[in-house]
């Protein structure tokens, strides 16, 4: 690229832009061919000449010079006539020769045009026989390379015309700004689309390479200002457009998995939104079902997962486990006593489609987020929680449970339990003060919301393990919970790693802890699958407890990241 230079005192702004643009654009250019094109384009002499003209005009625009005379051409002609009548000497002959030169006449003509400001084009008069109903036609030429055009078409049921149904955000059509929803398509590359089906036109477009020429009649409907692209949602279901019979164009669909963060680019269509994956450098959006449309489809489907927990013979409290404390002396009672009142273990949650989210990172003066551990019986939730507490008891804490049973001699109120009367416990139940509660041997046991608040008030991270049906009640702006699902490995790994462990939910006839059986392993896996099927849209991360040490290290790393990094949370948590 030739060196750029300007005269002394001229504005170098545009020259600096031209000189730096190729280097600035280099990280965003995919091929060396495109980069060479940019260097050649910005090095064109004609472009530099235009820049010089622009700067000269800009200079005179600021100076605003006034013409001394508006008719220099007429003055020159009068002067020439007068000189013809004089005696001709060498100087007069030279002046007459100069005034007759075409270049000077053209210069004076341009001067008069600028002085009189008569440079605006004069349009011809409108013809008298024009049809008032005739539509204006626009010719558009787009270069789409190998990417899709980024627009869908449909046949207008009333007029039979082929119209643009949708413009995909970030696609070639959207970037051009020349094609709009509602535009009527007349020709593609000189081929009339009259009496053609949309599928035939799509085939023509697919066969076209490089530049495509459209003849369209612009839509008269004004498009509202585009404020899209600022909304982010968390997907609460898996979606594969190739399997969706309702999508208008499978190729335009965007596939995603449960838990993916999507940036919503357009909600103009009530049935099909346009979105892209958060952080994706590709500007093109894809079609996804709208929240309302997907909710209607889910509502029409029959539930495939039973709400009733698995029944296991001779297991008095199968499917439930609750350790209200980690280092209490009577753990043998609490391990198997808990049964939630009025609780199906896997209740029917709201129809999960999308949840609007925003990026959140805790500020130094804010309380810590509540950390919830969820997992099936025997998976090791309590052991992982215990190891975290042992590792840093000053930074992490657990709740103290409430009970209505009598205090034993070696117990202290507020340490092992918070001891309250049955009447007060039932009053607190009525006032929804308990996260979970149960009854064992005519005594109530429960975890209260205030016990969570008490841990957080000490500037500690509260570690809480609950049944999954309690999650939706804890997902509030007050607690901003981070939910970790502890998942069992395969049954083969369970047999290998836990065969010699002691079951925590039952005793044999002599009161000794029983080893895990295949029945326990199967129940653990089935319980985990049921939890995932119904509640995994609440889970922020999943840890497979294949090896306790590895699972603990992963848990500790997750807790450290939670304090240092931003995470996506429901937007309602930040606005309340």
Swiss-Prot record:
PROSITE patterns xref list: GUANYLATE_KINASE_1, GUANYLATE_KINASE_2, L27, PDZ, SH3
Family: Belongs to the MAGUK family.
Annotated keywords: Cell junction, Membrane, Repeat, SH3 domain, Tight junction
Spans traversing the lipid bilayer: none
Gene3D superfamilies: 2.30.42.10, L27 domain, P-loop containing nucleotide triphosphate hydrolases, SH3 Domains
Ranges for domain PDZ: 139-220
Domain SH3: 228-298
Membrane topology reported for the UniProt record: Peripheral membrane protein
GO CC annotation terms, alphabetical: adherens junction; bicellular tight junction; membrane
Compartments where located: Membrane; Cell junction, Tight junction; Cell junction, Adherens junction
Residue ranges constituting the L27 domain according to the UniProt record: 10-63, 65-122
Biological role stated in the UniProt entry: Acts as an important adapter that promotes epithelial cell polarity and tight junction formation. Involved in the assembly of protein complexes at sites of cell-cell contact.
Domain Guanylate kinase-like: 368-560
Protein's name according to its UniProt entry: MAGUK p55 subfamily member 7
